[in-house]
From Swiss-Prot:
It holds the Pfam family YfbU. It comes from Mannheimia succiniciproducens (strain KCTC 0769BP / MBEL55E). This is UPF0304 protein MS2240. InterPro entries: UPF0304_YfbU (IPR005587), YfbU_alpha-helical_sf (IPR023146), YfbU_helix-hairpin_sf (IPR023145). Belongs to the UPF0304 family.
Length: 164
């Protein structure tokens, strides 16, 4: 991470203030302040990893995934016979916190800060799937988009999407 002396001073002061405002994490902020003030290149790379970039297309895919899960839930509720499918299978489980952090962060922004999709967000605390889900969700999206009536899915269509 390349920074001018002025930028480093501003960031170091911000870390100092964060340490004062958040005593529980003061040690973490003091470490970060020291790294920035010292200009330690190796550790500055660590800071750069905190700034994730998620493309517009990736954001759209996350939103489409949430919309697909909404459609699955609505369609399930409208089924006359639910005996071959449990509601548990329709639960969105989130993204892997280690390998899919940028998607998980965007998901948390959309559901937490923006307050969208709250009606069906029942994933485990933090929505950490603990296994990569991006490719699975993309396969599911392809199946869902191929359905003629995306919000009036049959039992077979729901199962095909879930099994993609």
């Amino acid at each position: 991470m390349e920074m001018t002396s002025t930028q480093r001073l501003i960031l170091a002061n911000q870390y100092k203030l964060m340490g004062l405002l958040d005593p529980a994490n003061a040690q973490k902020y003091a470490r970060l302040e020291t790294i920035v003030k010292g200009g330690f290149s190796l550790e500055l790379k660590e800071l750069d990893n905190e700034f994730l970039a998620i493309s517009e297309a990736e954001c759209q895919t996350v939103l489409e995934t949430l919309e697909m899960y909404h459609a699955l839930q609505v369609s399930y509720e409208n089924l006359a016979d639910k005996s071959d499918l449990t509601a548990h299978r329709l639960q969105f489980i989130g993204y892997d916190a280690i390998r899919e952090r940028k998607y998980l962060n965007y998901l948390r922004f959309i559901t937490g800060i923006e307050g969208k999709y709250q009606e069906f967000m029942r994933c485990a605390p933090g929505c950490d799937s603990q296994t990569p889900m991006w490719d699975k969700y993309n396969k599911m999206l392809d199946m869902w988009k191929a359905c003629p009536h995306q919000y009036h899915l049959s039992l077979v269509e729901i199962q095909n999407i879930l099994n993609a």
